[in-house]
């Protein structure tokens, strides 16, 4: 029985506390495809993602892993082949003020004929300026998980499909490690068990009492990275984490 469950619907209707997984580039861009929707719905999470990428772009680091499929080592440029877990950000799920356009007052308002009417109009404009914000509706409290599967983006710059799949396998292994480390840390209060993973979660604004929920995702790599979904699905099944994959009806993107 497959541990990957595929359904039709809207990924962003995932239950409260769910972790939404999507494939990312390492340049700090959520510019197109479903990534643009992530950026719109979770702007605070996007800022954390972008800062994470810029850190490695400014101070490059590499790490080496032996690829069992090729029986040889390969150097990864961080954050390539890793996973970034971003806890729910209050600015993303709490109602937020939104800027509202204002009408500029007329330059001759209150001058010459009709001065009284000009004053009254000015008062109306003053009152309208006080209503400068509209509240954005509250969103769901979702975790965001970024799998860094391609170094760059764009048809001519993205990584080749085989490299994207290797990066996906590596990133899923990293995700499993982080989930296990966080679970171990939450089961004891000993400072000795604190891991770099939990420190990273705290640094991004997460609360230790927050628990990572179900894993939900889109058809990873199948959109702008143009990797056949069945190939990525096989990698996810090998990784061993149960994930619900949501595909919009009639849609063919990631």
Curated annotation (Swiss-Prot):
Entry keywords, A to Z: Hydrolase, Protein phosphatase
GO MF annotations, alphabetized: phosphoprotein phosphatase activity
Alphabetical GO biological process terms: peptidyl-glutamate ADP-deribosylation
Binding positions (substrate): 9-11, 23-25, 30-35, 220-226
First-level EC class: hydrolase
Domain Macro, first and last residues per copy: 1-254
InterPro entries with a match to the protein in the record: ADP-ribose_metab_enzymes, Macro_dom, Macro_dom-like
SUPFAM superfamilies: Macro domain-like
Highest rank taxon of the organism: Eukaryota
UniProt biased composition (Low complexity): 91-102
Region of interest (Disordered), ranges: 86-125
Catalytic activity: ADP-alpha-D-ribose 1''-phosphate + H2O = ADP-D-ribose + phosphate
EC number of this enzyme: 3.1.3.84
Function: Highly specific phosphatase involved in the metabolism of ADP-ribose 1''-phosphate (Appr1p) which is produced as a consequence of tRNA splicing.
Family as reported in the entry's similarity comment: Belongs to the POA1 family.
This protein's name: ADP-ribose 1''-phosphate phosphatase
Record organism: Ajellomyces capsulatus (strain NAm1 / WU24)
Gene: POA1
């Amino acid at each position: 029985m497959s541990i990957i469950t595929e359904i039709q619907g809207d990924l962003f209707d995932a239950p409260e506390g769910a972790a939404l997984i999507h494939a990312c580039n390492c340049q700090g861009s959520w510019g197109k495809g479903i990534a643009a929707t992530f950026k719109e719905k979770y702007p605070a999470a996007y800022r954390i993602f972008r800062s994470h990428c810029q850190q490695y772009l400014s101070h490059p680091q590499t790490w080496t892993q032996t690829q069992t499929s090729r029986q040889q080592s390969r150097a990864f440029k961080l954050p390539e082949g890793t996973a970034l877990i971003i806890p729910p950000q209050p600015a993303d799920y709490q109602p937020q003020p939104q800027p509202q356009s204002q009408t500029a007052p007329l330059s001759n308002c209150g001058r010459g004929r009709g001065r009284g009417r000009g004053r009254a109009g000015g008062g109306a404009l003053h009152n309208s300026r006080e209503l400068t914000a509209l509240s954005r509706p509250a969103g769901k409290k979702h975790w965001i998980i970024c799998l860094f599967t391609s170094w760059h983006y764009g048809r001519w710059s993205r990584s080749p499909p085989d490299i994207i799949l290797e990066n996906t396998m590596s990133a899923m292994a990293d995700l499993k490690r982080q989930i296990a480390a966080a679970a171990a840390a939450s089961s004891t209060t000993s400072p000795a068990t604190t891991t770099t993973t939990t420190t990273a979660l705290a640094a991004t604004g997460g609360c230790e009492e927050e628990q990572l929920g179900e894993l939900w995702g889109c058809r990873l790599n199948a959109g702008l990275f143009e990797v056949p979904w069945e190939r990525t699905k096989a990698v996810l099944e090998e990784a061993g984490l149960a994930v619900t994959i949501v595909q919009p009806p009639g849609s063919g993107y990631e």
